[in-house]
Amino acid sequence: CVGMPGQTLEIKDKVIYLDGVANKEPDNVQYSYYVATKRPIGEKLRRELGISKEDLANHNANGTYYYLPLTQKAYETLSKRTDIVEKITPVVEEHGQGLYPVNKYTGWSVDNYGPLWIPKRGETIALTLDNLPFYERPIAVYEGNDLQVRDGKIYINGKESSEYTFTMDYYWMQGDNRHNSL
């Protein structure tokens, strides 16, 4: 669990911030890289780098161009292997697709995301058409309300609503393999 109810989460240049304070990264955090090699990465090096067989399978037909999640240690080890490696390039996503909320274009990416307030039971937010995409699913699906937008106005259970009080706590979960966690 990364974010707790009532906290504001933001990711800036891959660093997670909670309520404006940088979160310590786990020791084995992974980021994705494009890796061009002179020949396929062998089993011994795969094990040394801690790369799963599934991740190593993500390559081109001749096994010389990979999309790999690497820890800092694996990145440094692989960078020194000039006998195998031609180039390692960090994956940089300018604008993420399939990121929450999926019903609003935010311009956010997995490396630069938010800020997003995590709902807390008993807390009330001003509800606007601008922030509705962030909270529509919790309000309608998880808390079981009938939520509709008609003529530019928000209705919850048939009543026009400009605010909402959450009845449940929510959490932000994110794994160590950051580019495959959102």
Locate each region found by the language model:
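Extended hydrophobic leader/signal-anchor segments used for secretion and membrane insertion
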Residues: 1-182
